[in-house]
């Protein structure tokens, strides 16, 4: 060794920079708005706030880190909606989950007059296959074709009595 300082990658040192603006659900201001929002199936736009999360060794409310200093540390992001309790390893997955609570569906099908909306882009991509008739999975025992592998597996089990093991 030549005595030069070696710089090691320490992901826990830059943990605070990992957090982006996450929407968090805040409770309604008055009891009247609570009764009004309880009849609605989605949370109103006035109840959704965006905050910049300052994280000092994983003290942000949406992140619970396990095993500090370990390269294999896992970050669990907790949904802030009371009574939900769902956790995610990635901030983006938590953000997508929060759309379920807010009813936000930013991904819109642009196929002619369809206009269906989705809260995740992968759902939109899968939906577009219904318009294009794209069948990527074919049954080897009959002529049926499917756009999703899980539908093919369900077909094999129910029609041909074949259990597919992954």
Curated annotation (Swiss-Prot):
Belongs to the Sp1 C2H2-type zinc-finger protein family. This is Specificity protein transcription factor 2. The gene is sptf-2. Coiled coil: none annotated. Disruption phenotype: RNAi-mediated knockdown causes hypodermal or cuticular rupture, typically in the anterior body region. Abnormal gap between the outer layer of hypodermis and muscle and the internal organs, perhaps due to defects in cuticle integrity. It comes from Caenorhabditis elegans. Residues 31-42 have a biased composition (Low complexity). Transcription factor. Probably acts downstream of the Wnt signaling pathway. The lineage of its organism: Eukaryota, Metazoa, Ecdysozoa, Nematoda, Chromadorea. One of its GO terms (biological process) is canonical Wnt signaling pathway. The keyword Hydrolase does not apply. PANTHER family: KRUEPPEL-LIKE TRANSCRIPTION FACTOR (PTHR23235), SPECIFICITY PROTEIN TRANSCRIPTION FACTOR 2 (PTHR23235:SF168). It holds the Pfam family zf-C2H2. Keywords: Metal-binding, Repeat, Transcription, Transcription regulation, Zinc, Zinc-finger. Gene3D superfamilies: Classic Zinc Finger. GO terms for molecular function: DNA-binding transcription factor activity, RNA polymerase II-specific; RNA polymerase II cis-regulatory region sequence-specific DNA binding; zinc ion binding. It comes from the Eukaryota. A zinc finger (C2H2-type) spans 77-101, 107-131, 137-160. InterPro entries: Znf_C2H2_sf, Znf_C2H2_type. Disulfide bonds: none annotated. Residues 17-45 are annotated as: Disordered. SUPFAM superfamilies: beta-beta-alpha zinc fingers.
């Amino acid at each position: 060794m030549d005595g030069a300082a070696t710089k090691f990658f320490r992901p826990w040192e830059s943990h605070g920079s990992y957090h982006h603006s996450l929407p968090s659900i805040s409770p309604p201001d008055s009891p009247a708005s609570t009764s009004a929002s309880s009849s609605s199936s989605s949370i109103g736009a006035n109840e959704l706030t965006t905050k910049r999360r300052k994280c000092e060794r994983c003290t942000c409310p949406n992140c619970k880190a396990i095993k500090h200093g370990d390269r294999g540390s896992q970050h669990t992001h907790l949904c802030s909606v009371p009574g939900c309790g769902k956790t995610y390893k990635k901030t983006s997955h938590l953000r997508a989950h929060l759309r379920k609570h807010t009813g936000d569906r930013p991904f819109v099908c642009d196929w002619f007059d369809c206009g269906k909306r989705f809260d995740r882009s992968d759902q939109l991509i899968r939906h577009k296959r219904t318009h294009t008739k794209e069948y990527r999975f074919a049954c080897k025992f009959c002529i049926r074709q499917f756009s999703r592998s899980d539908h093919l597996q369900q077909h094999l089990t129910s029609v041909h009595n074949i259990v597919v093991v992954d």
